[in-house]
């Protein structure tokens, strides 16, 4: 029994140490390959915000159309011009079929990961990591991820640097710190899960969801929302993805916000919602595990 307890504690420490500041300070110089250097905060982006936005809109729109049968309440609240846009897109997708009349006879057979593959040419999913004692990891399950592609998103509750996160952070290896001090809690268990669900329900406007909470379950609607399980690179395994911060613009379509896997801890109309995406640093083949740099050094 003591041996099993010690092994459990050791495994938890191996995962948590990358968030423990004293350990980081003492070990940075020993693992130079695990660091990512940028000259200044403004040059931290691998691709433009426009490219990130374009990818998210493309994927979310495809998910929306695939689930069109269940969107009737949302569509009833949208302007006619927006409804017409989706009807036209749906008609193009199913050429020659009067979908607006017959859609109820057709059952959507595509899973979210299949939609991701059809849209971007690859799919990703959680699986047991190839690293010993690393727990879960994220793999390319199908297709090829081209360099510069958005390959996943880091889900979770977004905290401004002045907001309380002490209790949520205890023993939590899923706290992501942005360059400006904003924190994202990507833990899908315990108090973190409760907080996210509470904020998700708070911001809902009737049928309009302002964020996606399915990443907390086994039935994920946004197949990109697995970024919290991407493991740190090592001296033996170089990073093939990197984190990139992205602020959701005010013009983001309200009907597609149901796929955003992030929610602000405090309701604040003034601040844009912070998201973090993972971008491919090179072409990544099917079967490869994703590895990132947990540390970015701004010089």
UniProtKB/Swiss-Prot annotation:
GO terms for cellular component: mitochondrion; nucleoplasm. S-adenosyl-L-methionine binds at residue 294. InterPro entries: SET_dom (IPR001214), SET_dom_sf (IPR046341), SETD9 (IPR040415). Residues 122-295 form the SET domain. Belongs to the class V-like SAM-binding methyltransferase superfamily. Gene3D superfamilies: SET domain. One of its GO terms (molecular function) is lysine N-methyltransferase activity. It is an enzyme of class 2 (transferase). It comes from the Eukaryota. It comes from Homo sapiens (Human). Its EC number is 2.1.1.-. One of its GO terms (biological process) is regulation of signal transduction by p53 class mediator. This is SET domain-containing protein 9. Keywords: Methyltransferase, S-adenosyl-L-methionine, Transferase. Signal peptide: none annotated.
């Amino acid at each position: 029994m003591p041996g099993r307890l010690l092994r459990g504690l050791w495994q938890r420490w191996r995962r948590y140490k990358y968030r423990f500041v004293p350990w980081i300070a003492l070990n940075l110089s020993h693992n130079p390959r695990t660091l990512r250097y940028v000259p200044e905060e403004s040059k931290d982006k691998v691709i433009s915000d426009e490219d990130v936005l374009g990818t998210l809109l493309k994927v979310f729109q495809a998910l929306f159309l695939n689930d069109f049968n269940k969107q009737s309440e949302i569509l009833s609240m949208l302007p006619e011009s927006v409804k017409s846009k989706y009807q036209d897109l749906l008609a193009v997708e199913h050429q020659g079929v009067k979908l607006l009349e017959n859609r109820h006879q057709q059952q959507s057979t595509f899973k979210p990961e299949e939609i991701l593959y059809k849209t971007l040419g690859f799919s990703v999913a959680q699986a047991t990591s190839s690293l010993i004692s690393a727990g879960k990891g994220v793999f390319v399950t199908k297709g090829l991820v081209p360099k510069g592609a958005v390959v996943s998103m880091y889900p979770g509750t977004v905290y401004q640097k002045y907001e309380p996160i002490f209790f949520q952070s205890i023993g939590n290896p899923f706290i992501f710190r942005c360059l400006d001090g904003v924190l994202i809690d990507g833990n899908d268990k315990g108090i973190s899960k409760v907080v996210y669900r509470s904020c998700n329900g708070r911001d809902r406007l009737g049928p309009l969801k302002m964020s996606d909470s399915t990443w907390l379950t086994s039935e994920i609607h946004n197949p990109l929302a697995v970024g919290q399980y991407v493991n740190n690179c090592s001296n033996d395994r170089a990073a093939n993805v990197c984190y990139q911060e992205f602020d959701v613009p005010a013009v983001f379509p309200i009907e597609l916000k149901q796929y955003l896997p992030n929610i602000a801890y405090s309701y604040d109309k003034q601040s844009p919602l912070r998201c973090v995406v993972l971008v491919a640093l090179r072409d990544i083949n099917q079967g490869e595990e994703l590895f990132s740099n947990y540390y970015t050094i701004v010089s």
